[in-house]
UniProtKB/Swiss-Prot annotation:
Phenotypic effect of disruption: Male mutants fecundity is normal.
Function: May be involved in acrosome formation of spermatids.
Cellular localisation: Cytoplasm; Nucleus
Official protein name in the record: RING finger protein 151
Primary localization: cytoplasm
Keywords, in A-Z order: Cytoplasm, Differentiation, Metal-binding, Nucleus, Spermatogenesis, Zinc, Zinc-finger
Subunit structure: Interacts with DTNBP1.
Length: 239
């Protein structure tokens, strides 16, 4: 990868004194060696990683004596460059030093739609128009972090405090409804348990009464049997 600026970036061909002898691009962060030859900082460090001599004169290089040439860097920064979006229609030219500033505002810069769920990329100049048509499908999170999902144009009227308060009220009511439902179930279970206890008590009483009746019947039967036997014996004696 080249360490310098691509020649095609510039509005007019740069002077050869601004070119790097290693990458043949325009010098980026120009760095001068002790022998006075100047290269892109990245280019010369890559070169010196393989051999410790100047690419031009082959003199040995002492790294601690290498210096960045800030004056030359500023001169190169004033060279006029074309917008990187020239192919998309931008005809603007500006100093190299202002390249990023222009790029951040260029109407021909390709931008991703910020609406959540939308994957369309449009030019910055028509992004607002796209968002107006995209708002029914595209949504975005509240930038203040309340967690609300907003339609594209709702942000101006969005109130985080109100949204959070309403969400809290809804959650509180939902929890209250759940609690009342659980309490109702507990009451029904308690009532059912009480009825079962009553029925078990009644059944126990019935069983106890049956046991008493059975016991009394057995006692009476025991008392009657000896008397009958005695009467039978006496009758046989008389005969």
């Amino acid at each position: 990868m080249s360490g310098g600026y691509d020649l095609n970036l510039f509005a007019s061909p740069p002077d050869c004194k601004f070119l790097c002898s290693v990458c043949h691009g325009v010098l980026k962060r120009p760095t001068r060696l002790p022998c006075s030859h100047i290269f892109c900082k990245k280019c010369i460090f890559r070169w010196l990683a393989r051999q410790n001599t100047c690419p031009c004169c082959r003199k040995e290089v002492t790294r601690r004596k290498m210096v960045e040439v800030n004056k030359l860097r500023k001169t190169i920064g004033r060279l006029q460059v074309k917008c990187k979006n020239a192919a998309a229609g931008c005809l603007d030219t500006h100093p190299l030093a202002h390249r990023k500033e222009h790029q951040d505002s260029c109407p021909f810069e390709l931008m991703a739609c910020p609406n959540e769920g939308c994957t369309v990329q449009v030019l910055r100049g028509v992004l607002d128009e796209h968002r107006q048509h995209c708002q029914q499908n595209g949504q975005q999170r509240c930038p203040l972090g309340c967690g609300s999902t907003l339609a594209a144009l709702e942000g101006e009227h969005h109130n985080c405090y109100r949204e959070l308060r309403d969400a809290w009220v809804q959650r509180h009511e939902r929890n209250r409804t759940l609690l009342l439902g659980l309490l109702g179930r507990v009451r029904r279970v308690h009532l059912t348990t009480s009825i079962i206890h009553q029925q078990l008590a009644q059944l126990s009483n019935f069983l106890e009464d049956d046991d008493n009746l059975l016991l009394n019947a057995q006692v009476q039967e025991t008392e009657v049997t000896p008397e009958a036997e005695m009467r039978g014996t006496q009758g046989q004696s008389v005969l």
